[in-house]
Amino acid sequence: MIENMFSIPIVKYRCTNWKQKKQDFLALLNEQTLTMGEESVYSDYGEYDTLTAEHQMGLYDTPNYLNRIRELLKEEMEWFAHDLNADPQIVRAWFERALYKNHHPPHTHGHGGWSAVLYIEYDPTVHTSTVFVSPFNHFVTGMQLNYMPEVEEGDLVLFPSFILHYTQLNESDVQRTVASFNMTVDMDNIPLGWLTKSNKGDSKQTVIKPLSGL
């Protein structure tokens, strides 16, 4: 008898009322300042309004930015709570936009919790979804195992934060825009790395620079 010792979940939801939510997310994004960082994409990741922890933790006040995202994804978080028998709380959120030749190198979001990506502007004819890298290789060939979910605009993909992942080069002139966030399954289990001021409310990412010419 053959049994599988390990499995890694990934959750995908189609956002309700997406036409309106897309406009709401884009309006929120347009209020932010996106800059190019070491991730080789435009993001507001380091801006103050994206930084948060529950105010009772005594580290940051919860900004309207985060509250708005919580409101927009309230129903989807209720689905996650039901499916995983959890009490999910979004504790950090940011936007990311990839223009021509932009990409996000391989990285993780720390040792615990869940993370998510919401595809806001995404054309499957010219864009590719997030690439997830297995923490173990193929048991026969030893080759690296990758997984790319099939997605479209309005899809919300949630995954364990420790999973290495990246985005491929945007080879088109069509911008690719996502919202990302970190969340905990309940407020008693927030990864400590997300609550340190030096890490701006998030775990310190491990960024692997791409090879020259890629």
Q: Where are the regions a protein language model picked out?
A:
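Non-heme Fe(II)/2-oxoglutarate
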Residues: M1-L84, H103, N199-D202, G213
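Short beta-strand micro-motifs in enzyme catalytic cores
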Residues: P9-V11, Q175-A179
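UBC/E2-like fold recognition across ubiquitin and ubiquitin-like conjugation systems
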Residues: K12, L28-E38, F132-H138, E152-E153, ...
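Catalytic core of non-heme Fe(II) oxygenases with the double-stranded beta-helix
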Residues: Q89-L158, Q168, Q175, V185-L195
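Double-stranded beta-helix
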Residues: V131, N182-L214
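Glycine-rich nucleotide phosphate-binding loop and flanking beta-alpha elements
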Residues: H165
